[in-house]
Amino acid sequence: MSTFAVLLLCVQACLIQNVYSQCLGRVGPGGPPLGPYGGPLGGPGYGPVGYGGCGGYGGSGIGNVAVAGELPVAGSTGVMGQVPVIGAVEFAGPACAVGSVSISGACGPTCGCGGSPYY
């Protein structure tokens, strides 16, 4: 195998170990004389204080973000070219906008000739 392939294999092994390993932050030295100053592997790492161990990385959910309050946004945005929107665009609640919108060209999913949609 080439040197680059071996290096790539080692990097992948480190990444896999990082993903599937246990968080052992603040694990101190072991042994009977140093027992109160460090915890066993996987235990609380703050000695006799008794803080909980680290949890694994992971998350689940839909990914919605709720924003409450006023968000003063100022500025202008210029969009040139084609902006395809596939799917649904939805606003819930009052969405006040000040300014102007100009739409020109072929609107809707057409082939560009103003005919019937291509789907």
From Swiss-Prot:
Residues 1-21 form the signal peptide. It holds the Pfam family Chorion_1. It comes from the Eukaryota. Residues 56-103 are annotated as: Central domain. GO terms for biological process: chorion-containing eggshell formation. One of its GO terms (cellular component) is egg chorion. Keywords: Repeat, Signal. Residues 22-55 are annotated as: Left arm. The keyword Repeat applies. GO terms for molecular function: structural constituent of egg chorion. Residues 104-119 are annotated as: Right arm. InterPro entries: Chorion. This protein is one of many from the eggshell of the silk moth. Belongs to the chorion protein family. This is Chorion class CA protein ERA.1. It comes from Bombyx mori. The lineage of its organism: Eukaryota, Metazoa, Ecdysozoa, Arthropoda, Hexapoda.
